[in-house]
């Protein structure tokens, strides 16, 4: 049927238009309502008129349809602006001709014009559809479209124009037209379907639908109303439509028969074909009179259908024999409507074109546009709110992940050398001799350095040899015989000394820079070699990642998901931008102009639908975020392990890179510094060589003069014979030795000689040392050569030490130099050169006799004046400040000429002189203490100790004159031939003097000279005086009483000696040691002053230092513990040692003035950080000697009064001086306490109850304490619930801010050091941690963190682990000096250096690694041993009031348990019994919340304390239950915190302990080392016990190996003594001690000028020069010994 001829189509005629005069009406309306010039719209009106003319004379083609649509649209635009409807203001008559009747119809309504145009549009489309022959597919499509457009136009006209303006536009006619057009469109579609051979069933349904449309049209045509309207046309249309109905019905049944044939339903096939044939016959009947095209189509159909029917009937009759069903029984064919009226949009801009009247916009349109804009904004806000919420979640999630897609998988970067490093390699590749030149330059510098040092050493040797020869000459001929010598030669020699000292000072400063330069070169030369080498080696030196394939897969997966996240972000941003742009460009004002107000809302909804697609995309993007983040979380979990590896690799990579780049950048600087050093030393070498030649010539001249004098004296008559006694040979003094071994105090005799050299100061002090001058003239020469620093210009050059050492300073007053000699029996006048201060007269004192010269060393601040004759003047710069900034004014005095008197032994009394105030000079470095020897030496800043007689006090002291008696606090002469003067502490100035109603001159005005006390004949000052009774002559307001033994130690770093700037000959301070009492001596108190111990001489009483009270008595405080001090009795005196018992006096009062040594008072207590805190080591109880009147019993010491202003001064640690459990009743009491203590926490209920009470108490206490400051620094707190209280937090004084999460925990036990409980440093707070350690002068750090926590990076490693690789934290550099691992802990010795200062502090870092974060240590024993180690290290430090820093991860859990057990153990060891642990816990928590965080920790501490008490009982012979009592073996490890004195180089001890022990090998027995026990520590009365309760002789627990099971007898034999090795004979005699002394970072020096001077041997200890050696003969029958204690040196 596809070739069937096409049926004809029905089409409609066009209506004809009449007049439409709209121009005048529009102009009037514009003028009236818009207020605009109507003439301005003439052009628009012309355009509209032209468009109408084209529309009413439209062409019969597709372009005509566009013209009609455009004109229809412009009419709508005009109507929206100018109301021209029926009855409206601008209505104009419109005329059109009616089609069927040909009449003209007029209406005053613009809608009539629109309706006529719509009708013509539909008619034109029907014409165009019917005109096509439909022979091609394209023609069929075009015709179908035209008929649908025509149906659409008629349908729009029917729906939107309900009023029938004319008959041809009535509703019935319009419905007929719609059905006709749809039927013809469906017919075209049928023809196309048959041409395409669609399925038979589909074609049948399409054909049936054609039948349905035509049936609807036929019913309309049969309507009488319609028939009357149509007239003649109605009959023609009806015949054609009826014929088509039957024809297309036949076509439908034909195709249904084809479908039955396909389904092999042959009976149905026959029925359908029969029906089709019947309907076709009906169509033929109705086709009579139709055109030939219709007849051809019917014939073609008959041939097809007839043939099909005949064939089917035959097949069924002869083959299939199926029954032919009736047509009614078969399934009816339902039509399939595939066409529809195409809608007409009159205002479609694509059709209407631009609005001609766009300039005319009514206000209603603007209002509607605003409403639409609000709808758009609402839509945008809604979407943006969703996007922002999702973006915020995404940003927070990604920030928490800290994942950067660019760095997640950047493994490629590690395979290449970075560009900045490549540049350095390239720069070095063109200079191949870089390393060679640097090494050669440093070698040349080292050679010149060595030459200069050798020359300076030669000069020093010459000067020392000359001085030694001069001394020998004086010893041989006597002072009178020696004579002053040629003054010119001495002046030249003094000039040489000054020049040598100046060059030596410069050389030593430069040697520091030289060593630093060598260190820097050694640090960088390896890196420079690497950078100069092949690139492969450089690449190999950089760390590389070692990842498994699984790790790489994890990285790729994470990278892929991160890319998805980024893609999601980008898509979201893009969609958001599209939405914004679309909304911004969306303007429907033109549409609103043409839209009715009633349809506004509908229009808005339709317009907003254009955003639906973007909204869907955005919502899908937002919904996908949850899935992406879930996948990213899983990938990040897998990435954690890989991330840690890559993070560590990145740190190592950057560190290595920075190190290599820094080495390259340091090369030029090293070369420059090296060249400067060579230039400097070349200049210095020439000057030193000149000085050497000069010194040689002067010394040769001096030697010749001495030889002449000796020859002349030998010719004289020899002196009469004197009693002789054996004396050791006078060996040559060691080089650089400032004093003789016999002249030094016992503390220093066991040290290497370099430790006793006065001017050998560490480099950091060179810049502050005052110049020293020896004035030519007859002043006493030193018996030992010493080096001195000279003033004057330095050699040119800029090669010097660190900058801070060379800063210009004000004229800082310095203390007098220290020289240690026994006090002679005469005095020499030593005054002061007048300065700028007011002048004061100085009372002169006559010479007390003639003897060996008294050595005097001073520190002048300017070249001295040239004096002649016996007059001698020196300018002294006293130190005026300590670290506590105690400033004393400086004044100068006129030194009167000495008055010679007969050579009679006279007692000499110090006369304190009033000193006016002058400008205080701050001193930058601490002045711990100094010793000076002389007569009128001023006592400088607080705590200056002088040995001599007349001394001046500097500072604002009250003006008092002292009677002829030695005031308190001044040297006390010893009786006996070997007695020596004792240095006493400098009295502290008090604000108001107290009157002294004594027979003495009254205080004078400052301008009046002080009268000279007249000497009176009396006993010799150094003769045997068995009946001397000193009376306590005291100035309590000048010398406040202080309980000895508990003064705060000085603040310098433990393990090394900090010398006082400007003071020569300082001995290193020693720690407090204890001595066993010998068979005939009293226990020696701890001693650290630089004083010699006298040897036993003839029988004489020994004074006991007694202490006067404070101005007013106060209760005995923690710092006022009475300590018994007993001086050593004579070796062979049978009488008991008498003691002086002073009585307390609230205020100074009058007293007799006997010429006897009075008692001395201890210095006052100082605040923490005060340089004078060394009083603990130099307090009166440590001074061996003093008068001791007859009488027995212990001295009663008075409690000191703590000043109110000193209320919060730190308390020094109480030492456990002796074993408190020697008494059986103490042991029995401890055993009873242990039995009761065991059951306190026996069951869980008791533990729970105690813990609950502690928690409640903590909450109660915490409510009254503030942590406001800690809350301000939340980033510095590891846990937000663990913060220090404001009241006792540690305050940083020099950081960016003053906060650190650390609390001071004090008051747990008098025997437990103060603790600083802090958290483990965070990566950002490590600098604060080390700053706190530096400011608090901490020497011991306890770390209670397991290795697992550091490996997991829960706790940052804030300390260096490799030597030579220091860590820099802010301004502090921390370096590892040594490391030692034991079974219980790891001990590290660290050095702490502030910025670029050369001075370093050593501290001990004790790490207990076996305490897990959640759990307990393996055993209590390990922790107990660790606590003992901690306490032992703490006792090695100086002073004993600095805190111990203890930290775990949080600073409360393990830290609290450690502090609790530490305090409890110390209480038990002190004999105070077992403390109440809950009370200690509450005391800790009152100072830091959450201390002892777990209940398990409390139980553990209870068990550990039980175990410790059991150990204490076992040590004293009390066995555990079930074991027999064994003899007490004190050789077991003593758990008392006593200093270990039984080792020098032996034993398995940490190197830090050996270093600290060096300073303690100083006390030796007064009777020589005949008794082995004499080398043991002495006893001091234990705190807390009354003096009378101390037995006369008690054993002291010691850490030495030999056992001591019984108290020492009164006079035991040597073989009964415990075998204790003598300190001087341990190890190599000298080199070992020198090695130990140089082990501390402060003592160690690369300065080769110190080499070659350590020549001590065993003979130095056995045969000392001054007769004080171990084998020195002790003459007891020499009557001359009463006059000269150094007589044995002069015997031949």
Swiss-Prot record:
TPR repeats lie at residues 250-283, 374-407. Sequence repeats lie at residues 977-978, 979-980, 981-982, 983-984, 985-986, 987-988, 989-990, 991-992, 993-994, 995-996, 997-998, 999-1000, 1001-1002, 1003-1004, 1005-1006, 1007-1008, 1009-1010, 1011-1012, 1013-1014, 1015-1016, 1017-1018. It is found in: Nucleus; Cytoplasm; Cytoplasmic vesicle; Endosome. Residues 884-894 have a biased composition (Polar residues). It comes from the Eukaryota. Keywords: Cell projection, Cilium, Cilium biogenesis/degradation, Coiled coil, Cytoplasm, Cytoplasmic vesicle, Cytoskeleton, Endosome, Hydrolase, Methylation, Nucleus, Phosphoprotein, Protein phosphatase, Protein transport, Repeat, TPR repeat, Transport. Plays a role in sorting of endocytic ubiquitinated cargos into multivesicular bodies (MVBs) via its interaction with the ESCRT-I complex (endosomal sorting complex required for transport I), and possibly also other ESCRT complexes. May act as a negative regulator of Ras-mediated mitogenic activity. Plays a role in ciliogenesis. Interacts with GRAP2 and GRB2. Interacts with UBAP1 and CHMP4B. This is Tyrosine-protein phosphatase non-receptor type 23. The gene is Ptpn23.
């Amino acid at each position: 049927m596809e070739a069937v001829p096409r049926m004809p189509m029905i089409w409609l005629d066009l209506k004809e238009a009449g007049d439409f005069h709209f121009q005048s009406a529009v102009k009037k309306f514009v003028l009236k309502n818009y207020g605009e010039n109507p003439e301005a719209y003439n052009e628009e009106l012309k355009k509209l008129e032209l468009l109408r003319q084209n529309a009413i004379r439209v062409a019969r083609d597709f372009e005509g349809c566009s013209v009609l649509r455009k004109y229809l649209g412009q009419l709508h635009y005009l109507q929206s602006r100018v109301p021209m409807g029926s009855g409206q203001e601008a209505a104009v008559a419109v005329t059109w001709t009616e089609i069927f009747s040909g009449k003209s119809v007029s209406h005053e309504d613009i809608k009539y014009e629109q309706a006529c145009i719509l009708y013509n549009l539909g008619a034109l489309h029907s014409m165009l559809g019917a005109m096509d022959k439909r022979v091609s597919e394209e023609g069929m499509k075009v015709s179908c479209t035209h008929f649908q457009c025509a149906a659409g136009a008629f349908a729009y006209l029917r729906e939107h124009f309900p009023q029938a303006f004319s008959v041809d536009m009535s509703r019935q006619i319009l419905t007929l037209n719609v059905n006709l057009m749809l039927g013809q469109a469906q017919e075209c579609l049928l023809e196309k379907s048959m041409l395409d051979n669609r399925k038979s069933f589909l074609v049948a349904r399409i054909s049936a639908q054609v039948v349905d449309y035509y049936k609807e049209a036929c019913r309309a045509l049969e309507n009488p109303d319609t028939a009357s309207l149509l007239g003649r046309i109605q009959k023609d249309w009806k015949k054609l439509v009826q014929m088509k109905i039957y024809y297309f019905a036949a076509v439908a049944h034909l195709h249904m028969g084809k479908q039955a044939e396909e389904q092999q339903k042959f009976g149905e096939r026959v029925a359908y074909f029969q029906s089709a044939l019947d309907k076709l016959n009906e169509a033929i009947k109705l086709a009579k009179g139709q055109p030939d095209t219709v007849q051809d189509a019917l014939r073609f159909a008959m041939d097809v259908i007839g043939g099909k029917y005949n064939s089917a009937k035959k097949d069924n009759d002869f083959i299939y024999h199926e029954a032919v069903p009736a047509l009614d029984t078969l399934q009816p064919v339902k039509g399939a409507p595939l066409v529809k009226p195409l809608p007409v949009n009159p205002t479609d801009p694509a059709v209407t074109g631009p609005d001609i009247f766009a300039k005319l916009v009514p206000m209603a349109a603007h209002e509607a546009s605003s409403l639409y804009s609000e709808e758009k904004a609402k839509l945008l806000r809604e979407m943006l709110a969703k996007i922002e919420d999702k973006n915020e979640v995404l940003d927070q999630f990604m920030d928490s992940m800290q994942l950067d897609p660019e760095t997640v998988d950047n493994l490629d970067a590690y395979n290449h050398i970075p560009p900045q490093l490549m540049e350095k390699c390239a720069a070095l590749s063109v200079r191949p001799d870089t390393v060679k030149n640097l090494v050669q330059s440093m070698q040349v510098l080292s050679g010149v350095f060595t030459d200069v040092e050798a020359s300076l050493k030669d000069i020093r040797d010459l000067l020392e040899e000359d001085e030694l020869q001069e001394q020998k000459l004086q010893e041989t001929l006597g002072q009178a015989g020696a004579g002053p010598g040629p003054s010119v030669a001495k002046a030249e020699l003094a000039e040489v000394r000054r020049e040598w000292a100046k060059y030596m000072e410069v050389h030593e400063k430069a040697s520091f820079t030289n060593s630093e330069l060598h260190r820097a070169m050694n640090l960088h030369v390896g890196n420079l070699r690497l950078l100069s080498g092949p690139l492969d080696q450089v690449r190999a030196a950089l760390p590389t990642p070692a990842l498994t394939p699984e790790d790489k897969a994890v990285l790729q997966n994470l990278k892929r998901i991160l890319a998805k996240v980024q893609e999601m972000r980008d898509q979201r941003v893009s969609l958001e931008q599209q939405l914004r742009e679309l909304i911004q460009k969306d303007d429907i004002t033109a549409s609103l102009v043409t839209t009715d107000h009633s349809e506004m809302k509908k229009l808005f909804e339709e317009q907003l639908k254009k955003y639906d697609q973007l909204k869907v995309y955005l919502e899908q993007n937002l919904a996908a975020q949850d899935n992406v983040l879930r996948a990213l979380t899983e990938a990040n979990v897998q990435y954690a392990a890989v991330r840690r590896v890559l993070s560590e690799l990145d740190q190592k990579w950057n560190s290595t890179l920075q190190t290599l780049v820094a080495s390259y950048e340091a090369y030029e600087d090293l070369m420059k510094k090296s060249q400067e050093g060579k230039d400097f030393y070349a200049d210095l070498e020439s000057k030193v060589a000149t000085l050497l030649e000069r010194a040689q010539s002067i010394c040769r001249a001096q030697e010749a003069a001495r030889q002449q004098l000796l020859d002349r004296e030998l010719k004289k008559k020899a002196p009469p014979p004197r009693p002789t006694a054996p004396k050791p040979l006078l060996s040559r003094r060691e080089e650089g030795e400032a004093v003789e071994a016999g002249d030094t105090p016992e503390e220093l005799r066991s040290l290497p000689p370099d430790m006793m050299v006065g001017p050998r100061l560490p480099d950091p002090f060179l810049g502050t040392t005052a110049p020293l001058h020896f004035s030519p003239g007859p002043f006493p020469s030193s018996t030992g050569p010493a080096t001195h620093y000279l003033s004057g210009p330095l050699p040119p050059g800029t090669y010097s030490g660190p900058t801070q050492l060379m800063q210009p300073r004000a004229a800082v007053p310095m203390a007098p130099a220290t020289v240690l000699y026994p006090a002679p029996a005469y005095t020499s006048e030593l005054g002061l050169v007048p300065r700028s201060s007011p002048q004061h007269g100085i009372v002169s004192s006559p010479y007390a006799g003639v003897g060996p010269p008294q050595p005097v060393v001073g520190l002048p601040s300017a070249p001295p004046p040239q004096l002649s004759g016996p007059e001698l003047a020196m300018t002294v710069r006293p130190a005026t400040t300590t670290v506590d900034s105690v400033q004393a004014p400086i004044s100068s005095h006129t030194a009167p000429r000495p008055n010679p008197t007969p050579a009679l032994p006279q007692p000499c009394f110090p006369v304190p002189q009033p000193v006016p105030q002058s400008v205080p000079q701050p001193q930058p470095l601490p002045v711990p203490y100094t010793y000076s020897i002389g007569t009128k030496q001023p006592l400088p800043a607080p705590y200056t100790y002088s040995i001599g007689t007349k001394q001046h006090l500097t500072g604002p002291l009250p003006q008092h004159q002292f009677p002829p008696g030695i005031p308190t606090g001044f040297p006390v002469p010893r009786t006996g031939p070997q007695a020596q003067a004792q240095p006493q502490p400098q009295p502290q100035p008090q604000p108001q003097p107290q009157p002294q109603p004594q027979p003495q001159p009254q205080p004078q005005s400052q301008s009046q000279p002080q009268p000279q006390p007249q000497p009176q004949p009396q006993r010799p000052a150094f003769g045997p005086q068995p009946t001397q009774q000193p009376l306590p002559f005291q100035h309590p307001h000048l010398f406040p009483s202080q309980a000895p033994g508990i003064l705060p130690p000085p603040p310098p770093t433990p393990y090394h000696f900090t010398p006082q700037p400007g003071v020569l000959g300082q001995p290193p301070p020693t720690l407090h040691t204890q001595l066993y009492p010998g068979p005939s001596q009293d226990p020696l108190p701890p001693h650290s002053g630089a004083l010699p111990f006298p040897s036993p001489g003839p029988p004489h009483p020994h004074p006991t230092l007694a202490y006067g009270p404070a101005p007013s008595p106060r209760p005995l405080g923690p710092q006022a513990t009475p300590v018994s001090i007993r001086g050593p009795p004579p070796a062979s005196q049978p009488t008991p040692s008498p003691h002086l018992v002073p009585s307390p006096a609230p205020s100074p009062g009058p007293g007799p003035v006997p010429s006897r040594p009075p008692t001395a008072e201890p210095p006052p207590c100082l605040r923490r950080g005060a340089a004078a805190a060394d009083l603990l080591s130099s307090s009166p109880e440590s001074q061996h000697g003093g008068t001791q009147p007859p009488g027995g019993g212990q001295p009663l010491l008075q409690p000191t009064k703590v000043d109110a202003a000193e209320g919060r001064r730190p308390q020094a640690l109480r030492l456990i001086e002796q074993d408190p459990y020697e008494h059986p009743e103490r042991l029995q009491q401890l055993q009873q306490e242990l039995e009761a203590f065991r059951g306190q926490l026996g069951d869980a209920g008791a533990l729970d109850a105690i813990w609950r009470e502690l928690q409640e108490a903590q909450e109660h206490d915490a409510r009254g304490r503030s942590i406001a400051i800690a809350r301000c620094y939340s980033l510095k707190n590891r846990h937000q619930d663990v913060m220090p209280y404001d009241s006792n937090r540690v305050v940083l004084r020099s950081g960016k801010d003053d906060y650190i999460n650390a609390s001071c925990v004090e008051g747990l036990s008098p025997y437990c050091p103060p603790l600083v409980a802090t958290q483990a440093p965070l990566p950002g707070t490590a600098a604060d941690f080390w700053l706190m350690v530096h400011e608090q002068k901490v020497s011991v750090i306890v770390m209670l963190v397991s290795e697992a926590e550091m490996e997991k990076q829960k706790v940052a490693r804030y300390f260096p682990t490799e030597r030579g690789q220091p860590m820099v934290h802010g301004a502090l550099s921390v370096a590892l000096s040594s490391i030692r691992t034991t079974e219980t802990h790891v001990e590290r010795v660290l050095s702490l250096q502030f910025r670029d200062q050369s001075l370093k502090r050593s501290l001990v870092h004790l790490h207990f690694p076996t305490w897990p974060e959640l759990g307990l240590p393996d055993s209590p024993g390990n922790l107990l041993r660790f606590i003992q180690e901690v306490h032992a290290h703490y006792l090695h430090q100086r002073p004993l009031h600095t805190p111990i820093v203890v930290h775990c991860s949080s600073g409360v859990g393990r830290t609290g348990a450690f502090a609790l057990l530490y305090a409890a153990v110390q209480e038990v060891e002190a004999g105070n019994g077992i403390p109440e642990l809950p009370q200690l816990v509450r005391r800790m928590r009152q100072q830091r919340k959450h201390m002892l965080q777990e209940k398990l920790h409390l139980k553990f501490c209870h068990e550990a304390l039980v175990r410790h008490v059991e150990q204490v009982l076992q040590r004293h012979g009390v066995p555990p239950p079930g074991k027999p009592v064994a003899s007490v073996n004190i050789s077991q490890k003593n758990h008392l915190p006593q200093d270990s004195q039984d080792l020098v180089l032996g034993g398995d001890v940490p190197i830090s302990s050996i270093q600290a022990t060096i300073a303690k090998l100083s006390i030796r027995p007064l009777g020589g080392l005949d008794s082995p026990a004499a080398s043991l520590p002495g006893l001091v009365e234990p705190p807390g016990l009354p003096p009378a309760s101390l037995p006369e002789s008690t054993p002291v627990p010691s850490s030495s190996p030999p056992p001591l099971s019984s108290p020492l007898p009164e006079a035991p034999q040597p073989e009964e003594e415990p075998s204790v090795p003598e300190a001087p004979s341990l190890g190599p005699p000298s080199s070992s001690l020198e090695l130990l002394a140089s082990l501390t970072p402060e003592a160690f020096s690369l300065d080769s000028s110190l080499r070659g001077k350590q020549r001590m041997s065993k003979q130095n200890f056995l045969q000392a020069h001054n007769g004080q050696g171990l084998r020195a003969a002790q003459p007891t029958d020499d009557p001359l010994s009463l006059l000269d204690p150094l007589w044995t040196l002069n015997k031949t």
